[in-house]
Amino acid sequence: MKTPTGRFRVGEKIGAEMPSDTVFRNRIPLEPGDPLPPTEDLVMSRILWLDGLDEDNANTRDRFIYIHGTKHEDKIGLPDSHGCVRMRNVDVAELFKLVDEGTHVIIEE
């Protein structure tokens, strides 16, 4: 799926105080030794779960579209996710500290 564009807000912040190499499954941090999800597209570090504010992106939350960290930092900027916005783990951890739930976000092509 393509990353939706338009106006959004941060609906929920997940992962405060977690180590930057934390892997999440269904928004729950895995414990060391837990099996990794059966995907290469791991959600890591922090999650900013987006709510769509436009008619064209109103289903964003239901599609589980996040801004999140990744283990594939070399693919940042390439169309390689399932619709999420991937960031370097250190960068998404910093962004996480700077925004509150309800902060507005604009995603453009």
Would you name each region that the model predicts?
Residues 1-14, 18:
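Electropositive
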